[in-house]
Amino acid sequence: KGLSGPAILQISNYWNEGDEITIDLLPGIDLLSVINEHKPYKTELVNVLAKFFPKRFTEKWCELNFPSIPVNRLSDKDIEMIDERLHNWKLVPKGTEGFGKAEVTKGGVDTNELSSKTMESKKIPGLYFIGEVVDVTGWLGGYNFQWAWASGFAAGQFV
């Protein structure tokens, strides 16, 4: 259905619709050596790659990028192309599943419109904004909770 997980959620903070994303699907893996180790055998490409990815992903990747043939039939140029595509996988996401399914969002009340000490609106005295309603983005891992508590505490000192 699409891509998800911590890395994709983190990238989504910076991605704009229509932007291309480049992903190294095998960081730290010398795929050229891995494929060449299987060259003496009739191991299908899909089976070599399945050691690194879920089977459905591997099958779909081969379907879209390179037919799964025995690696002993691959030329050096073929192997280099496969390596390049997996270490520099380029895609343009078609979009998201929308706000209803979002795990992260961006936007909100501009921090320049608030007192950083009190979280009070500079335009409307007595109006305070805290937590996820403020345009503050952090790394995954509970930072949104910390921001909610800290900004709530700051505002609470002045309400």
Set out the residue ranges of the language-model regions.
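An anion/pyrophosphate-binding glycine-rich loop and adjacent beta-alpha core
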Residues: K1-K77
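Gly/Ser/Thr-rich beta-alpha loop segments that engage phosphate groups in nucleotides
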Residues: S4-A7, V109-D110, V133, L140-N144
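N-terminal low-complexity, intrinsically disordered patches enriched in charged
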Residues: I11-Y14, S116-K117, S151
